[in-house]
């Protein structure tokens, strides 16, 4: 009986060590992939409190994002470092927001995204790598298990909105035209 207990303890210990090693390997591979990225172009589906929006974005590290929404307002979002502008082209109106406390900044800055990868709790499925990071705000980041591409994130923003953002990368490391991420002037 004692032999069986020792045998199962050894098997359990080997299983735990292999799991930790696999997790470290996944994180190392994602880190390598992120370090090679300077920019991505992607399409997205965004779900905020039950409302779905779709569009396409250009993301350039660090801190630059431009998204065009496929909606009737012809909404355009531009982030350049810590400034955010949302323009509704149909109505020719632009709204400006501070985002300095937004958990969304964790995605726009590669060093913060790498911190999530290194410190986040890893969960694996057949298709997705899920990293859960608890800091001031909870953020969950998703990566494709095969390609290690960023697939999306889930956050609760500073206004307590549940935001689920899924993306499909179209291109990597493109160079965008100068002025692409210019914040529109105040009207």
Give the residues covered by each predicted segment:
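Short hydrophobic/aromatic-rich beta-strand segments that constitute the beta-sheet cores
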Residues: 42-44, 65-69, 84-87, 131, ...
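A short, Trp-centered hydrophobic/proline-enriched beta-strand micro-motif
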Residues: 32-52
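An acidic-aromatic
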Residues: 57-106, 163
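Gly/Pro-enriched, hydrophobic low-complexity segments
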Residues: 115-187
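Sec-dependent signal peptide recognition
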Residues: 6-14
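Solvent-exposed strand-loop boundary residues in beta-sheet-rich modules
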Residues: 48-50, 90-92, 159
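Hydrophobic h-region of N-terminal signal peptides that target proteins for export
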Residues: 15-24
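Cleaved targeting-peptide boundary
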Residues: 24-32
């Amino acid at each position: 009986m004692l032999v069986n207990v020792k045998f199962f303890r050894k098997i359990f210990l080997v299983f735990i060590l292999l799991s930790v090693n696999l997790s470290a390997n996944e994180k190392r591979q994602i880190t390598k992939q992120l370090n090679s990225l300077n920019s991505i172009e992607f399409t997205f589906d965004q779900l905020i409190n039950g409302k779905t929006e779709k569009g396409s974005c250009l993301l350039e590290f660090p801190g630059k994002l431009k998204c065009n929404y496929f909606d009737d307002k012809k909404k355009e979002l531009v982030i350049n470092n810590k400034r955010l502008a949302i323009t509704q082209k149909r109505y020719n109106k632009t709204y400006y927001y501070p985002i300095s406390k937004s958990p969304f900044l964790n995605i726009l800055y590669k060093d913060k995204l790498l911190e999530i990868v290194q410190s986040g709790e890893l969960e694996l499925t057949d298709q997705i790598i899920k990293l859960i990071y608890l800091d001031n705000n909870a953020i969950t980041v998703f990566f494709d298990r095969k390609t290690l591409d960023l697939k999306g994130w889930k956050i609760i923003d500073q206004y307590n909105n549940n935001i689920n953002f899924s993306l499909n990368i179209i291109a990597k490391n493109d160079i965008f035209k100068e002025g692409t991420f210019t914040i529109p002037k105040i009207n």
